[in-house]
Amino acid sequence: MAKEDSIEMEGTVVDTLPNTMFRVELENGHVITAHISGKMRKHYIRILTGDKVTVQLTPYDLSKGRIVYRAR
């Protein structure tokens, strides 16, 4: 899938799940399940509850996403 096909949205981490999965509430109110991208995992970027994050969603399944950025 090409990078242009993904949808990027802002959200807040609501809950931490096992296996580096997180429950993220998007700005529009939807709650999705998201995992950390490989580069964030490689650079040991920690994500805590309450962090503002940028999430990439695919048009095929809007209930799952990938966390690509954590706001400072």
UniProtKB/Swiss-Prot annotation:
Does this UniProt record's set of keywords contain rRNA-binding?
yes
- The keyword Transcription is annotated on this UniProt entry: no
GO terms of molecular function: ribosome binding; rRNA binding; translation initiation factor activity
Keywords (A to Z) from UniProt: Cytoplasm, Initiation factor, Protein biosynthesis, RNA-binding, rRNA-binding
User: Which is a Pfam family this sequence falls into?
Assistant: eIF-1a
Annotated compartments: Cytoplasm
Main localization of the protein?
cytoplasm
* Self-association state and partner proteins as the record states: Component of the 30S ribosomal translation pre-initiation complex which assembles on the 30S ribosome in the order IF-2 and IF-3, IF-1 and N-formylmethionyl-tRNA(fMet); mRNA recruitment can occur at any time during PIC assembly.
Query: What biological function has been recorded for the protein in this entry?
Result: One of the essential components for the initiation of protein synthesis. Stabilizes the binding of IF-2 and IF-3 on the 30S subunit to which N-formylmethionyl-tRNA(fMet) subsequently binds. Helps modulate mRNA selection, yielding the 30S pre-initiation complex (PIC). Upon addition of the 50S ribosomal subunit IF-1, IF-2 and IF-3 are released leaving the mature 70S translation initiation complex.
HAMAP family per record: IF_1
Against PANTHER family, the record matches this protein to:
TRANSLATION INITIATION FACTOR IF-1, CHLOROPLASTIC
| Protein family per UniProt | Belongs to the IF-1 family.
- The protein here is known as Translation initiation factor IF-1
What is the organism of origin for this protein? Nitrosococcus oceani (strain ATCC 19707 / BCRC 17464 / JCM 30415 / NCIMB 11848 / C-107)
